[in-house]
UniProtKB/Swiss-Prot annotation:
GO cellular component: chloroplast; ribonucleoprotein complex; ribosome
Cysteines joined through disulfide linkages: none
Main location: plastid
BP terms from Gene Ontology: translation
Transmembrane segments: none
Name of the protein in its database record: Large ribosomal subunit protein bL33c
Compartments it resides in: Plastid, Chloroplast
GO molecular function: structural constituent of ribosome
UniProt keyword annotations, A-Z: Chloroplast, Plastid, Ribonucleoprotein, Ribosomal protein
Domain of life: Eukaryota
Keyword set includes Ribonucleoprotein: yes
Pfam families: Ribosomal_L33
Lineage: Eukaryota, Viridiplantae, Streptophyta, Embryophyta, Tracheophyta
Length: 66
């Protein structure tokens, strides 16, 4: 029997501190990463600690809607 392809989905992670603080005055932009998640194992929105080149530090990146 064939497996369903809808289990793994692509998600976009966006820096929460850049969005909250407006954008850094030195360089404009918001850090975004693209990754995949398994909907069965992780039904809640994904949050990972990643490096933000605009904040120059590791910050929490949260899943956003497409």
């Amino acid at each position: 029997m064939a497996k369903s392809k809808d289990v793994r989905v692509a998600v976009i992670l966006e820096c929460t501190s850049c969005v909250r603080n407006g954008v850094n005055k030195v360089s404009t932009g918001i850090s975004r990463y693209i990754t995949q998640k398994n909907r069965h194992n992780t039904p809640n929105p994904l949050e990972l600690k990643k490096f933000c080149p605009y904040c120059y530090k590791h910050t929490i990146h949260g899943e956003i809607k497409k």
